[in-house]
Amino acid sequence: MGAEEEVLVTLSGGAPWGFRLHGGAEQRKPLQVSKIRRRSQAGRAGLRERDQLLAINGVSCTNLSHASAMSLIDASGNQLVLTVQRLADEGPVQSPSPHELQVLSPLSPLSPEPPGAPVPQPLQPGSLRSPPDSEAYYGETDSDADGPATQEKPRRPRRRGPTRPTPPGAPPDEVYLSDSPAEPAPTIPGPPSQGDSRVSSPSWEDGAALQPPPAEALLLPHGPLRPGPHLIPMVGPVPHPVAEDLTTTYTQKAKQAKLQRAESLQEKSIKEAKTKCRTIASLLTAAPNPHSKGVLMFKKRRQRAKKYTLVSFGAAAGTGAEEEDGVPPTSESELDEEAFSDARSLTNQSDWDSPYLDMELARAGSRASEGQGSGLGGQLSEVSGRGVQLFEQQRQRADSSTQELARVEPAAMLNGEGLQSPPRAQSAPPEAAVLPPSPLPAPVASPRPFQPGGGAPTPAPSIFNRSARPFTPGLQGQRPTTTSVIFRPLAPKRANDSLGGLSPAPPPFLSSQGPTPLPSFTSGVPSHAPVSGSPSTPRSSGPVTATSSLYIPAPSRPVTPGGAPEPPAPPSAAAMTSTASIFLSAPLRPSARPEAPAPGPGAPEPPSAREQRISVPAARTGILQEARRRGTRKQMFRPGKEETKNSPNPELLSLVQNLDEKPRAGGAESGPEEDALSLGAEACNFMQPVGARSYKTLPHVTPKTPPPMAPKTPPPMTPKTPPPVAPKPPSRGLLDGLVNGAASSAGIPEPPRLQGRGGELFAKRQSRADRYVVEGTPGPGLGPRPRSPSPTPSLPPSWKYSPNIRAPPPIAYNPLLSPFFPQAARTLPKAQSQGPRATPKQGIKALDFMRHQPYQLKTAMFCFDEVPPTPGPIASGSPKTARVQEIRRFSTPAPQPTAEPLAPTVLAPRAATTLDEPIWRTELASAPVPSPAPPPEAPRGLGASPSSCGFQVARPRFSATRTGLQAHVWRPGAGHQ
């Protein structure tokens, strides 16, 4: 080892100094610097590891214990003067001459002594001092990296044993240098003054090339001697960073300092989500492996979506242009062009996978004759969707009829053909945008017959239909007729006016549109025109074909309930390829619309609306946006049609939305809808299907005005998506309304039979509910007997699992006292006959006790006393207790109002009740909803006397009106019979 030298190191700035000592008198070892924290004051001042302390602030360390030395250091205040002894031959590791060390303040990075001064002059006190104002001792900031050296030095800390001695043969710098990537570990003992200078100078540039790292750098890896708290790095820029090594990233700082900058979870999650989205988007759009399954699937799916969305003529005046792929608005068409021209090369960038493109191209060949470049046109029709052809047709029409519209939407280009885009833009898309203003626009595109191969596209329209659900199966055959793409602007009424009777047509179109796409588009057109059967000038564009399937009746369009067969649009519009069906043609041929065949079923009026929506709003946004939207909007290519697919009956909907409102005077009077509502959202859903059934019956356009039945009749097609208006007589017999929304239209109690899927579901539900109705003691007539045999029997009466199964409440728990127990439940109707249980003694209305759970369809909700069973003797209940309490362990039963004599309520042993299962009201349960005579039987639950009150289903409303509480306290352990 080289000669030892004494160096005076002055640290300023106050603790923590950033070094550690080991040894001491107690260990009979000299006090030695075991570790220097990088970027600490000690490191900046030039203190080095393995330096032996000779004196601390002038106090000799010869006999100092470690603790004494520490206390001296701690007491040093803002300046610590250490006299240390270090090996002179350490070279770069050696501390630079005091002068050099003084230079340490980064400003003098290059000032250090010439390389010749590897061995610093023996301590010159004060020579090593870090600037007093420096935060450097803990300033671990990026600013530290400002020094030139910084750039050179990697930030990676070097890890060395704190006391690792330099091998005698090798210069210490070598040992340390191995750590620093930039500098080779020179074996030069201490010679390169550059190393030293580097040590002294913040920028080690001088010797950066191969010079050993500065002493500071060497020290950096080591932690300070001081206790942890002193080691906390200061976050903040250091005006004169000595070297990169002395600086660290904020992340490192935060870790070291355990600084957790509070970043709200929300911010974190947002950042993560953004990152993920970007990653996913980049992986999907510029996939490293374009042929990976995920990418291919994604592209295929995107193509499929485009097939059905592009048709939307990008109506949104270019807004729609937003690409799912993130391609610029008009890029859709451009993309398609590229895809077609470059299909294979574009695999990554283009929407189409090369394999998929290949297939599409092959298919496109058949359609090539369509008049679009076989590469482009064919693919577009196949890949992009008939939209391209449609656009072509529309473009032709638009050229004549919708040029003004053209400017509205150059975005039409989106649809696959860049070439066509201008005309296309002129054509449908503008129309789409304009359509609302001009409801009459006839199907713009004379269906350009797809190539005979076009048949394939037809299915696509079907798909549209499927998503739009505008058509009833019946329509399918006629759908070609509906082909006419009539844009009925969302302002359908105006459209109707202009069209004359056309508006009614939409319902017909539904039928005609039928989901069935014309298998042969080419031939389909002619047939479609005839189907239109309306003078509507069939756009002779031949294939009215399946395009019509795309039509989505615009619910907004008031169609005559009769489904006035005003031709929604000329079949020709439909003829426009199946794609055409997608595009909105309304604006293009306003006159045509009147032409549209009158056939109610055939009139596809809504399609234009849907088309319109698609095209107008058709702002296709990035894939991610689409995904984001998907959560709210289930449909991939939002059929913007307003027709309610199975939208709940408006009445039901209003009921559901108004659950919180007080029930209208009487449950029965409120009408079936109200009652259904009382049943809870779930029940409403069931009712809804019934409504849906009626909807199907009703022509899509059928306004509420038409009698519910009328709407059913007029539309032959009875689109599945009848206007949400499908009337449901609210007042119709309770049973009628409740049992069967459809029946309500009929207005006959019989409808309770429930027709259609909705009815079945409802009946099922009701039969199941009957089991749970607790009217009287579970008697022989117990729940097992359903109201009316439901078309599809549901679970056997034995089925008893309650929807709310949880641990039973504590025995002492009285639900009535629970803060959550609705007041309504506490106050039961006074009218309770005192007759035997068999008598319609109203047990707590299931709904009452369940009012706070309106969403659950519980048997109690259906208390229909169609056929009140003979009051069975109350099994365990007091014989004449008027009050029947359902014991739902988890729902608080509402005690019957004392209005009825407070006959002691008999609580059955807990075993008697299933969790959350009310004791059956056999009377109510037995009454089948379907029974046409709901009025005769007053629901026991509602009326004081079972027959006196019309069937009333308690509404899930909270009301404190009933104050009578039963004398008995309900105990969860006991079942109430």
Curated annotation (Swiss-Prot):
Keywords: Actin-binding, Cytoplasm, Cytoskeleton, Methylation, Phosphoprotein. The modification Asymmetric dimethylarginine is found at residue 921. The modification Phosphoserine is found at residues 108, 111, 143, 178, 180, 345, 350, 374, 381, 384, 670, 678, 788, 790, 891. Residues 216-226, 530-545, 572-595 have a biased composition (Low complexity). The keyword Glycosyltransferase does not apply. It comes from the Eukaryota. One of its GO terms (cellular component) is Z disc. Gene3D superfamilies: 2.30.42.10. The modification Omega-N-methylarginine is found at residues 386, 466, 469, 479, 757, 806, 826, 889, 910, 921, 955, 957. GO terms for molecular function: actin binding. PROSITE patterns: PDZ (PS50106). Residues 194-203, 510-525 have a biased composition (Polar residues). It is found in: Cytoplasm, Cytoskeleton. Its main location: cytoplasm. The keyword Cytoplasm applies. Residues 109-123, 183-192, 436-450, 596-607, 704-730, 781-796, 929-938 have a biased composition (Pro residues). The modification Phosphothreonine is found at residues 141, 705, 713, 792, 892, 898. Residues 91-226, 317-352, 364-677, 697-802, 922-950 are annotated as: Disordered. GO terms for biological process: heart morphogenesis; positive regulation of actin filament bundle assembly; positive regulation of Rho protein signal transduction; positive regulation of stress fiber assembly; sarcomere organization. Residues 6-88 form the PDZ domain. Belongs to the synaptopodin family. Actin-associated protein that may play a role in modulating actin-based shape. This is Synaptopodin 2-like protein. It comes from Homo sapiens. The lineage of its organism: Eukaryota, Metazoa, Chordata, Craniata, Vertebrata. The gene is SYNPO2L.
